[in-house]
Amino acid sequence: MSDLVAKTAIDRRLADIVTPVIEGMGFELVRLRLMSGKTRTLQIMADRPDGGIVVDECAEISTAVSAALDVEDPIEENYTLEVSSPGIDRPLTRLKDFDVWTGYEARIETTELIDGRRRFKGELAGTEGDEVLITIEDGRDSYVTIGLKFDWLADAKLILTEELIAEMLRQKKASGNFDESQFDEIEESEGEEADEAEQPPTKH
């Protein structure tokens, strides 16, 4: 079964290099993307297994990953390395994510049309085998739970809600890395910016 952590061939190669480094530090790789542009950007999202990663830990991961990439040298051009937390309205990239975040709202997009649509919005209802379960609106005041094969998914992301913010605050407190100032302006914005550490453009 595939996942949404790394989609392209180069992303998967990079993930193979950095995953052991990240996991060896006690974290998990959530998503990896090598973005094009004037200077290429390697974007890495990582988190604690129980959530609550902070910016200092992102910086530590960035340093370790940069050293590993120096050895392997998989990217020919100069690039910038960015390591961040998934943020509150995080992407869902692994089948297990849909179990972890059961009961929270999400948006899911599929690669092909499913019953005439590609986009689904609703409450996550866990998984069943290789299917993601989501409860969606089916007419006025009527809801139905459907199953989407994980391999059909092109993108999936949590929707920012008060319940989700409360859960993220709980994770931060449980991790011992709670900084209330990080959440002061959440109600005034559409989403929470992720903790992030950036390495300057470099050639590895």
From Swiss-Prot:
Keyword Cytoplasm in record: yes
Cystine bridges: none
Record-linked Pfam families: DUF150_C, RimP_N
Compositionally skewed regions (Acidic residues) per UniProt: 181-198
Localization (cell): Cytoplasm
GO cellular component: cytosol
Stretches the record annotates as Disordered: 176-204
Location (main, coarse): cytoplasm
GO biological process, one term: translation
Cytoplasm found in the keyword field: yes
Keywords tagged on the record: Cytoplasm, Ribosome biogenesis
Similarity comment: family membership: Belongs to the RimP family.
Function field: Required for maturation of 30S ribosomal subunits.
Database matches in HAMAP family: RimP
Protein name, per record: Ribosome maturation factor RimP
Organism, as annotated: Cereibacter sphaeroides (strain ATCC 17029 / ATH 2.4.9)
Gene behind the chain: rimP
